[in-house]
Amino acid sequence: MRSHRCGEVNESLLGQEVGLCGWVHRRRDHGGVIFVDLRDREGLVQVVFDPDHPEPFSLAETVRSEYVIRVVGQVRARPEGTENPNLKSGRVEVLATSLEILNRSETPPFPIESDIEVNEEMRLRYRYIDLRRPVMQQRMRLRRDITRFLRNFLDHHGFYEIETPFLTKATPEGARDYLVPSRTHPHSFFALPQSPQLYKQLLMISGMDRYYQVVRCFRDEDLRADRQPEFTQLDIETSFMNEDQIMTLMEAMIRDLFRETLNEELPDPFPRMTYAEAMRRYASDKPDLRIPLELVDIADLMAGVEFKVFAGPAADPEGRVVALKLPGGGDLSRKDIDDLTRFVGIYGAKGLAYVKVNDLGAGLEGLQSPILKFMPESTIRGILERTEAQTGDLIFFGADKARIVNESMGALRVKLGQDRGLVEKGWRPLWVTDFPMFEWDEKSGRWVALHHPFTAPKCSEEQLRQNPGRALSRAYDMVLNGTEIGGGSVRIHRTEMQQTVFDLLGIGEEEAQQKFGFLLNALRYGCPPHGGLAFGLDRLVMLMSGASSIREVMAFPKTQSAWCPLIDAPAQVNDAQLHELGIRLRKNPAVEGGTVPST
């Protein structure tokens, strides 16, 4: 039907006849000559209809926006002064000699333009229209380029692409599973995989040596801007490599990816930082290194002061007291500070103390703060020295349980960096290493795995049992501009160590056999040392395309309430289907107020 795509028409085709198919992007009638901007995936080309060709000219008078047409015509140079430097085809046009309307279109619900603001629910309801917009076409093209490059890189390095099952078994991995009832096995359920974690470990035991997969994963969890109930991972596993070797290979892949697709150079090697250092300096295990603000611990300076807001957390083994200097922040008004106080309150902070440094040379007289009267001069001077404060700066304080301080002050650091224009340009990758093996869950009163229960510890089995709270894991996360784009670890490859970890997590031998017996059995048959990681493909494309959400780089995403406006899913099923599956609903949701909530 066509000889070329619209975006491929250029000066190399001057004088040639071409056949084009696409959508009418814009139609203009200028003094008896009709101009149509014809659009397809590759771009736009201007098509001219003049009265010298009466049949196509007459038909062109009837075409409207988003009609699908086929044009045959001759490529010619645009008249001097009418060139469009913004188009690849901007120096030429096609003089139409034939026109066929392949399909008509109703008026679209919104313009097919990249810079038009449209309600997100409307965009998702008419996603097939939204995906026609040039910006969405560019994102899908970049996603294709990224996926193709990653596959080629891994193929070149001896990895096999192997598919793993979608219908699997429910296992505790930190989020709720999507369950699928089995018709052939009554009262039993499959689960959709949260990741191929166990299957890829079994592939290493199978001797596959190096595996990867571009795979859909499913998690039934509360959604945030960077989460979806179904998402895509680049899943990787390899045998006989330690963490340094895995990290070196993976950062080479990401470095080559940025060079190939964005013409951007990333550092070689990527910097590395321990989890403890990241939390100490940035109150985050995925710090954005483009923001030049750091937290400073001052608990030792607060020991013994009468100001209980600081003294209490300073004396608490689980507490933390920090200072965060904002250079030039002395110009913030009281209203600005009140707004920031409400912001940190979202994360559990009970307030936001501060000191303005109006004139460092004037001593205490040059400082402004309601908390100065509660602290001795030596403490104040110690804070000024440790934060290296200068005239015009503003120092914020966080004091509470370490978790609350980290969450609130870490978020404040990012907000101040963004609001004050402090975020540096460029790409700042980072490896975060030496994560704790476990964290204590107050609600359940037990240890939980910080990553997953198959991560290998750095210590011996005996040391792990003696002090699980101090054990570090062989885990590593790749962070880019404050977003975790990949995470992995060296895995446990001995049955005894795996059972020890299960014991510490409160998973007894009987429960472990019931849920993970297949893995424990496989570990007994010559399991090699192995490790790997998974990259969030959606997040990676989001960052590289400059999109604000992973929904912007997925063809058919769900809303933040896990609903698809396009096909109205999830939806009810009829009684016959439920009966066949042996399921009976206790209540009828239709009677109780409808089916799916809107966003």
Swiss-Prot record:
Q: Chief localization class? A: cytoplasm
GO BP annotations, alphabetical order: aspartyl-tRNA aminoacylation
Top-rank taxon: Bacteria
Segment forming the signal sequence: none
The annotated site for Important for tRNA non-discrimination falls at H30, G81
Keyword Nucleotide-binding on this protein? Answer: yes
Q: Report which reactions are catalysed by this protein.
A: tRNA(Asx) + L-aspartate + ATP = L-aspartyl-tRNA(Asx) + AMP + diphosphate
Q: Name one GO cellular component term.
A: cytoplasm
Which Gene3D superfamilies does this one have?
Bira Bifunctional Protein, Domain 2, GAD-like domain, Nucleic acid-binding proteins
Q: Which residues cross the membrane?
A: none
Q: Which residues bind L-aspartate?
A: E173, R219, H451, R491
Which organism encodes this protein?
Methylococcus capsulatus (strain ATCC 33009 / NCIMB 11132 / Bath)
Provide the family line. Belongs to the class-II aminoacyl-tRNA synthetase family. Type 1 subfamily.
Give the E.C. number(s).
Answer: 6.1.1.23
**Keyword list, A-Z:** Aminoacyl-tRNA synthetase, ATP-binding, Cytoplasm, Ligase, Nucleotide-binding, Protein biosynthesis
A GO MF term: aspartate-tRNA ligase activity
What name does this protein carry?
Aspartate--tRNA(Asp/Asn) ligase
Subunit relationships? Homodimer.
